Design a protein with these regions (language model features):
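K/E-rich alpha-helical interaction surfaces of small helical-bundle regulatory domains
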Residues: 68-84
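Short, charged recognition helix plus adjacent turn
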Residues: 79-106
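The DNA-recognition helices of helix-turn-helix-type DNA-binding domains
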Residues: 45, 56, 71, 85
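The alpha-helix within a helix-turn-helix
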Residues: 28, 39, 68
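Short, basic-rich loop-to-helix N-cap that marks the start of a DNA-contacting helix
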Residues: 56-69
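N-terminal flexible/basic segments that precede or flank functional cores
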Residues: 1-26, 30-31, 96, 100-102
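Short alpha-helical DNA-recognition segment
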Residues: 32-51
């Protein structure tokens, strides 16, 4: 049976926040942390951090580990945000194509 739900495939459903956007809104802005200060604390170039914040580059394992250590978060937390973003973007790009794939019966 094909799903009639457009919840996850409708491009206008919800704003899909990139990991860098969430890094700023949930971690940096609340404590007044600048990208320059955070980059220096992480031991990375500010341009690298800015590219992730701008959504121009994806979060990677190296940056995830540095951020997790700095913010005392679980390793993989920031990669999880990136994965959630990429999955939603892929669903939107497929735009209903997944509905045409019949799940294999057990």
């Amino acid at each position: 049976m094909m799903s009639k739900s457009q919840t996850t495939t409708d491009p206008d459903w919800l704003h899909n926040s990139h990991a860098g956007e969430l890094l700023v809104s949930e971690f940096m802005d609340p404590i007044g942390l600048t990208d320059e200060t955070l980059a220096a604390s992480l031991g990375i170039a500010p341009a690298r951090l800015r590219a992730v914040i701008a959504g121009e580059q994806p979060m990677d394992a190296d940056l995830d580990l540095r951020l997790a250590r700095y913010f005392r978060m679980s390793e993989g937390f920031f990669l999880g945000l990136q994965l959630d973003f990429e999955l939603m973007e892929a669903k939107r790009a497929l735009n209903g194509e997944l509905d045409r794939i019949l799940p294999r019966a057990a």
